[in-house]
Amino acid sequence: MEGAFAANWSAEAVNGSAAPPGTEGNRTAGPPQRNEALARVEVAVLCLILFLALSGNACVLLALRTTRHKHSRLFFFMKHLSIADLVVAVFQVLPQLLWDITFRFYGPDLLCRLVKYLQVVGMFASTYLLLLMSLDRCLAICQPLRSLSRRTDRLAVLVTWLGCLVASAPQVHIFSLREVADGVFDCWAVFIQPWGPKAYITWITLAVYIVPVIVLATCYGLISFKIWQNLRLKTAAAAAEAAAGAEGEAADWAGRAILARVSNVKLISKAKIRTVKMTFIVVLAFIVCWTPFFFVQMWSVWDADAPKEASPFIIAMLLASLNSCCNPWIYMLFTGHLFQELVQRFLCCSFRRLKGSRPGETSVSKKSNSSTFVLSQYSSSQRRCSQPSTL
């Protein structure tokens, strides 16, 4: 994530031998230097993030593909959010990892622009697909009869992806392959000085962080109010029913009136509340991971004396990518049956392969009495594989 849309500070030395992005001239004769110890820490952190993001989100997609409930609306949004997290891992974390290993960008100008473009596409997609999933949960709780249809879900996701592709387009113009020192080229940003970096980073912060957080907070505020209202009315209805037996018909009519008021919120089932809890934890992880990143990005462009080469400053920029690692584990926590089905299917199919490769099994199955037993046992194994558990 570091340097995705701002200057690619990386672990360059504090002596400032490399020319800053967006400036002409002012180059030095010697090659740029960097803090090698900090660079090794960056590489180690990015390797860990890449492994966790790839493995976790791949498991989520595989589990969603094999589950019997693959047409669930929540699972539909989870699938696209996992795809967005894979885009972050492949097109953002991996290029940054290679970049930190080589120190400089080794590739043509077209590749430089493409890498910077795709880095921000993943960032936008991960944010706005999470926002879309939260809006869906808000509608499911607050307006259950007006919730989105399957066709509308697909259209909303398609528009979100297209919007992310369009919103990332400025990266192609801002970044290019430039000479940052005598004979040294790198993929750098070109801004109109002095207000260009401030305007662009502020816009990105508003679009990717501040506005989504405000919308997410509003959604979960409405959800919390609706759940509180649901609990309060149900408690009142239970009290009225209890009083009906003691006070006669008048109390019975009062209880019915309260039950009529609560009928529309009875649709808030435990399953829906559980999905709300899951998306809330995902949103909380989003805020925790992205806040340090945007804080240091804004600090770097609005304060000329910002410690851009300090270790905490650099590491804070890497934390945003942790969001793509956290989401799969949150899914596992709240939808454990998905992964139980995946593991059961894997173990069952492995057992079938091992059983089919045993020598002498064919000759045994030809016996008149035992053949029925073997075939029935094998077919039941097939049924267990094709029909995963619903736990």
Swiss-Prot record:
Chain segments annotated as transmembrane: 39-63, 75-97, 114-135, 155-175, 203-225, 278-296, 312-334
Keyword Transmembrane: yes
UniProt keyword Glycoprotein present: yes
Residue numbers on the Cytoplasmic membrane side: 64-74, 136-154, 226-277, 335-391
CC terms in the record's Gene Ontology section: plasma membrane
SUPFAM superfamilies: Family A G protein-coupled receptor-like
Swiss-Prot/TrEMBL GO biological process terms: cellular response to hormone stimulus; female pregnancy; G protein-coupled receptor signaling pathway; maternal process involved in parturition; positive regulation of blood pressure; positive regulation of cold-induced thermogenesis; positive regulation of vasoconstriction; regulation of systemic arterial blood pressure by vasopressin
List of residues that carry Phosphoserine: 368, 370
Keyword field: Cell membrane, Disulfide bond, G-protein coupled receptor, Glycoprotein, Membrane, Phosphoprotein, Receptor, Transducer, Transmembrane, Transmembrane helix
Glycan-linked positions: 8, 15, 26
Residue intervals on the Extracellular side: 1-38, 98-113, 176-202, 297-311
Localization, UniProt: Cell membrane
A GO MF label: oxytocin receptor activity
Gene3D superfamilies according to UniProt: Rhodopsin 7-helix transmembrane proteins (1.20.1070.10)
PROSITE patterns cross-referenced by the UniProt entry: G_PROTEIN_RECEP_F1_1, G_PROTEIN_RECEP_F1_2
Entry membrane topology: Multi-pass membrane protein
Disulfide bonds, paired cysteine numbers: 112-187
CDD domains: 7tmA_OT_R
Family assignment from sequence similarity: Belongs to the G-protein coupled receptor 1 family. Vasopressin/oxytocin receptor subfamily.
Entry function: Receptor for oxytocin. The activity of this receptor is mediated by G proteins which activate a phosphatidylinositol-calcium second messenger system.
Cited PANTHER family: NEUROPEPTIDE RECEPTOR-RELATED G-PROTEIN COUPLED RECEPTOR, OXYTOCIN RECEPTOR
Name of this protein: Oxytocin receptor
Gene responsible for this protein: OXTR
